Amino acid sequence: MKILLTGAAGFIGMHVAQILLKRGDEVVGIDNLNDYYDTALKLARLEQLKPYPNFHFIHGDISDRMTLEDLFEKGHFDAVINLAAQAGVRYSLKNPHAYVQSNIVGFANLLEGCRHHGVKHFVYASSSSVYGANTKIP
């Protein structure tokens, strides 16, 4: 399968990429490498993916519609795994527009890319912040 993986430089993204690559999938990873936390850590994760010939990285932002349109046009993806998100509740109160751009606009851009380019599978992980302060755990 050829998979577009957003948030590829994140902790979960890098591990998902490794699993997919080890099973033989082609992975195109995209990440904006923002400075919400140390970018050196993100770059180190990407270094771990470099040895895989079936991994390709794009430094880009899912909220940029034109970047995604170009990516979908050329990519011919079988699936999209969306792990890109601006996380952290406290920061969202200080910078709500960053959250809207990534978590809403970026998400919509991905859905539209899938719709217009016949991508049959879409996985969306969201973030732990959506669960709030629950006292009951499943």
Task: Spell out what each predicted region is.
Residues 1-138:
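N-terminal Rossmann-like NAD(P)+-binding domain of SDR-like oxidoreductases, especially those catalyzing
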